[in-house]
């Protein structure tokens, strides 16, 4: 596996409204999508940041630390490599909104993500 770049950053907060306002107004991040428990931002260069409400039922596996997503060319193959290396995997590969991703826990106990942009047809 070769990590190509940082591909995503996600964080969960108990101060959801304040954090969303901070990213939008103070940092000037563009809102790409707004859901009841998540706001997806894009930075000026297109880098994605998801801010999740701490009360959201989704992503309860997120801890207090931000989750960094590593972009790879083949998420299925990369996940298999992690499995062979004995890395703790969190669920199967998931797909949606043009991406495939898989979570894993690093030796530091933090959650990380492998992510791949899916080909468009």
List the predicted regions and their residue ranges:
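Short hydrophobic/aromatic beta-strand element in the GNAT-like acyltransferase core
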Residues: 40, 48, 69, 101-102
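Short, conserved charged micro-motifs
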Residues: 18, 75-79
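Vicinal oxygen chelate
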Residues: 1-2, 79, 83-121
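Short secondary-structure junctions
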Residues: 28-34, 88-93
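Conserved short beta-strand elements that form part of the metal-binding/catalytic scaffold
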Residues: 30-63, 111-117
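N-terminal beta-strand motif that seeds the catalytic metal site of vicinal oxygen chelate
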Residues: 1-20, 65-68, 118-121
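Exposed loop/turn and edge beta-strand positions of beta-sandwich/beta-sheet ligand-binding modules
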Residues: 5, 35, 64, 98
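Conserved active-site alpha-helix within GNAT-family acetyltransferase domains
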Residues: 17-26, 102, 111
């Amino acid at each position: 596996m070769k990590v190509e770049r940082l591909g995503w950053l996600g964080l969960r907060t108990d101060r959801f409204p304040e954090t969303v306002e901070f990213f939008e107004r103070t940092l000037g991040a563009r809102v790409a999508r707004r859901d009841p428990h998540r706001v997806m931002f894009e930075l000026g260069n297109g880098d994605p940041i998801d801010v999740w409400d701490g009360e959201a039922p989704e992503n309860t596996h997120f801890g207090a630390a931000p989750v960094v997503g590593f972009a790879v060319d083949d998420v299925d193959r990369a996940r298999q490599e992690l499995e062979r290396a004995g890395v703790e995997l969190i669920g199967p590969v998931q797909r949606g909104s043009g991406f495939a991703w898989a979570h894993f826990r690093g030796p530091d106990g933090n959650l990380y993500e492998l992510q791949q942009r899916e080909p468009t047809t």
